[in-house]
Amino acid sequence: MANEHKSPLDKRVTDLFKDIPTDISTHLITGETFSNESFQAIPVYTLTNVTVKQAVHLSYKLFESMKTTKCAAGYQYAIYLLAQRLLTPAAGSNDLVFKDYIPQGGSDLPQEIKNKIYVTTELSDSQTAGKSEAEKKKATADLIFGDNTDHDLQQVRSQDDETIIRFGSFISAFLMKLIVKQQSNIVDGWNGMLERYTNFYGESPITAVPKPNADWLAGLKNYLISDPKIGHTWVRVISAAENALSVGDKSFQMVRYLASLPLSLTGMHAYKLFLEVQKQSNLGMQWLLEEMVSPKTLPALEGIAKILKNFESRTSTRKPPYFRYARIMSPAYFQELQTKNCPELVYLLVCLLQKYEAFGAGQEPTKIVGIERVPANIRAEMSRAAGYIFSVAPQRNMGMYSDSMRKALVHQEKASTSRAGKEKADEVFGM
């Protein structure tokens, strides 16, 4: 019988592949190591707040524009400046939420853009000469609102300055999430936003202000992402506020609703899903990470471990939240956690979440961007892996169960999960 044992490769051949570095980056964008210092070194704008009258003017022009189907160029800067001027959540408040959190040392806007935003809202001597107080008041209103009377927005013109600014800045901060969200997110969340406005400020929204349509929002989104420095500046502002404000502060809660939650962990879906799996299962993080290791999942799991060790807060120590916005600031950060770079892990985590019935009615986990590209064989493998992890979790973590709870729960879990572990991927996802 012929000897089928394969001879080892010639040393000349094996020497060709020795000493290949293990930290080679093969991504189109060379990866960079994230740090809080590098986050704060990314170029941003440093913009002077608009005056009260200028903020009223910009708010009114925004409301006018939202009635149309086309967002004009330049509104991305006006909306950012209104968002930067967000007022603290208290009835009649004139204090600015972000007054202490505007980044310094950044660049200014081009003069041609500033001319359209920092408009003149005070009458000159020649414009007031020989005019009555009523005439002066009308002339000032024309400077701010324009001399064409829009009957649909008469309610806006009748409001006091602070009310207009409160609503204009709140809407603008809400619109700023278009730097990462689709326009449907704004449309679907509009009524909820109006309710939150009332909750925060104790007053009704200005009902004459229309909900923008999808085409207008698509235009605004294109303008916002055409200048990434706008998004970088907004992230610096809201992350600084999030880092400094007390968790119990109502301003913190408003910033969290308007910006932190929609922007946090953008492009880091694997990490977001891992946290949710840990939350739903209450299993140890180390145990979960080790159970999910394979050659294809390891790079992303390493990335998760680095974040947990270096950047997440502890129960007794609050750390800066900057890492949560890292991929908005630069696509070179945490690339291993992007869905397209770790589809196997993302699919595995989705399968685990379904085991814990963590998705609400109407939610479709398979609609996560990028997950549709996972091949059928990988889906089947990751579905089986999720079944095995789910089924062995009680047996591998017996120390977390009392004798009574072990008798009541673990036996039942073992029986039910042994069946669940045999499901195919198409059965798991109801396909």
Curated annotation (Swiss-Prot):
Compartments reported by the entry: Virion; Host cytoplasm
Entry GO terms, CC: helical viral capsid; host cell cytoplasm; ribonucleoprotein complex; viral nucleocapsid
Region (Disordered): 412-431
Pfam families xref list: Rhabdo_ncap_2
Keywords: Capsid protein, Helical capsid protein, Host cytoplasm, Phosphoprotein, Ribonucleoprotein, RNA-binding, Viral nucleoprotein, Virion
GO MF: RNA binding
UniProt keyword Phosphoprotein present: yes
Oligomer status and interactors: Homomultimerizes to form the nucleocapsid. Binds to viral genomic RNA.
Reported function: Encapsidates the genome, protecting it from nucleases. If expressed without protein P it binds non-specifically RNA and therefore can bind it's own mRNA. Interaction with protein P abolishes any non-specific RNA binding, and prevents phosphorylation. The soluble N-P complex encapsidates specifically the genomic RNA, with protein N protecting the genome like a pearl necklace. The encapsidated genomic RNA is termed the nucleocapsid (NC) and serves as template for viral transcription and replication. Protein N binds protein P in the NC through a different interaction, and can be phosphorylated.
Family assignment from sequence similarity: Belongs to the cytorhabdovirus nucleocapsid protein family.
Protein name per the record: Nucleoprotein
Organism of provenance: Northern cereal mosaic virus (NCMV)
Lineage: Viruses, Riboviria, Orthornavirae, Negarnaviricota, Haploviricotina
